[in-house]
Protein backbone atom coordinates (compact mmCIF):
# COMPACT_ATOMS: atom_id res chain seq x y z
CA UNK A 1 0.00 0.00 0.00
CA UNK A 2 1.37 3.44 -0.89
CA UNK A 3 1.76 6.31 1.55
CA UNK A 4 0.45 8.86 -0.96
CA UNK A 5 -3.00 10.23 -0.09
CA UNK A 6 -5.46 9.92 -2.98
CA UNK A 7 -6.84 13.25 -4.23
CA UNK A 8 -9.43 13.97 -6.91
CA UNK A 9 -10.83 17.09 -8.55
CA UNK A 10 -14.48 17.52 -9.49
CA UNK A 11 -17.56 19.74 -9.62
CA UNK A 12 -19.98 20.19 -6.71
CA UNK A 13 -23.45 18.98 -7.74
CA UNK A 14 -25.22 19.28 -4.37
CA UNK A 15 -24.64 21.13 -1.10
CA UNK A 16 -28.06 20.61 0.50
CA UNK A 17 -26.70 18.44 3.33
CA UNK A 18 -25.19 19.92 6.49
CA UNK A 19 -21.37 19.77 6.34
CA UNK A 20 -21.53 17.50 3.27
CA UNK A 21 -21.29 17.94 -0.49
CA UNK A 22 -21.75 15.71 -3.51
CA UNK A 23 -18.89 15.92 -6.01
CA UNK A 24 -19.13 14.65 -9.60
CA UNK A 25 -15.83 13.24 -10.87
CA UNK A 26 -15.67 13.06 -14.67
CA UNK A 27 -13.34 10.67 -16.50
CA UNK A 28 -12.97 9.49 -20.08
CA UNK A 29 -13.09 5.80 -20.97
CA UNK A 30 -12.35 4.29 -24.37
CA UNK A 31 -15.22 2.21 -25.78
CA UNK A 32 -14.01 -1.40 -26.10
CA UNK A 33 -15.43 -2.00 -29.58
CA UNK A 34 -15.63 1.38 -31.31
CA UNK A 35 -12.65 3.13 -29.73
CA UNK A 36 -14.52 6.39 -29.09
CA UNK A 37 -13.86 8.12 -25.77
CA UNK A 38 -16.97 8.34 -23.57
CA UNK A 39 -17.48 10.58 -20.52
CA UNK A 40 -18.24 8.65 -17.34
CA UNK A 41 -19.28 10.32 -14.07
CA UNK A 42 -18.79 9.11 -10.50
CA UNK A 43 -20.61 10.83 -7.62
CA UNK A 44 -18.77 11.00 -4.29
CA UNK A 45 -19.99 12.34 -0.93
CA UNK A 46 -17.38 14.53 0.78
CA UNK A 47 -17.10 16.29 4.14
CA UNK A 48 -17.28 20.12 4.07
CA UNK A 49 -16.68 21.26 7.66
CA UNK A 50 -17.38 24.97 7.11
CA UNK A 51 -20.20 24.68 4.51
CA UNK A 52 -18.18 26.92 2.14
CA UNK A 53 -19.01 25.16 -1.16
CA UNK A 54 -21.80 26.05 -3.55
CA UNK A 55 -23.17 24.15 -6.54
CA UNK A 56 -20.91 24.46 -9.57
CA UNK A 57 -17.67 25.02 -7.63
CA UNK A 58 -14.61 23.05 -8.76
CA UNK A 59 -13.06 21.45 -5.68
CA UNK A 60 -10.22 19.16 -4.65
CA UNK A 61 -11.08 16.31 -2.27
CA UNK A 62 -8.88 13.75 -0.54
CA UNK A 63 -9.56 10.31 0.85
CA UNK A 64 -9.87 10.01 4.64
CA UNK A 65 -11.18 7.61 7.27
CA UNK A 66 -14.89 6.68 6.97
CA UNK A 67 -16.97 9.51 8.43
CA UNK A 68 -20.35 7.87 7.76
CA UNK A 69 -21.86 5.04 5.71
CA UNK A 70 -21.26 6.86 2.40
CA UNK A 71 -18.68 9.55 3.30
CA UNK A 72 -14.95 8.78 3.23
CA UNK A 73 -13.64 11.87 1.42
CA UNK A 74 -12.91 15.38 2.76
CA UNK A 75 -12.72 18.79 1.10
CA UNK A 76 -9.16 20.09 0.65
CA UNK A 77 -9.71 23.35 -1.26
CA UNK A 78 -12.07 25.21 -3.55
CA UNK A 79 -10.22 25.61 -6.87
CA UNK A 80 -12.73 27.90 -8.61
CA UNK A 81 -15.99 29.44 -7.42
CA UNK A 82 -19.13 29.07 -9.54
UniProtKB/Swiss-Prot annotation:
Q: Which Gene3D superfamilies match?
A: Nucleic acid-binding proteins (2.40.50.140)
Q: Which keywords does the record carry?
A: Ribonucleoprotein, Ribosomal protein, RNA-binding, rRNA-binding
Q: Which residues cross the membrane?
A: none
* SUPFAM superfamilies assigned: Nucleic acid-binding proteins
* Assembly with partners or alone: Part of the 30S ribosomal subunit.
Q: What's this protein's family per the entry?
A: Belongs to the universal ribosomal protein uS17 family.
Function according to Swiss-Prot or TrEMBL: One of the primary rRNA binding proteins, it binds specifically to the 5'-end of 16S ribosomal RNA.
**How is this protein named in the record?**
Small ribosomal subunit protein uS17
Amino acid sequence: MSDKIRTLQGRVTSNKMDKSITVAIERQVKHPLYGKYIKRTTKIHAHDETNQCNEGDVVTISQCRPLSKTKSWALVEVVTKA
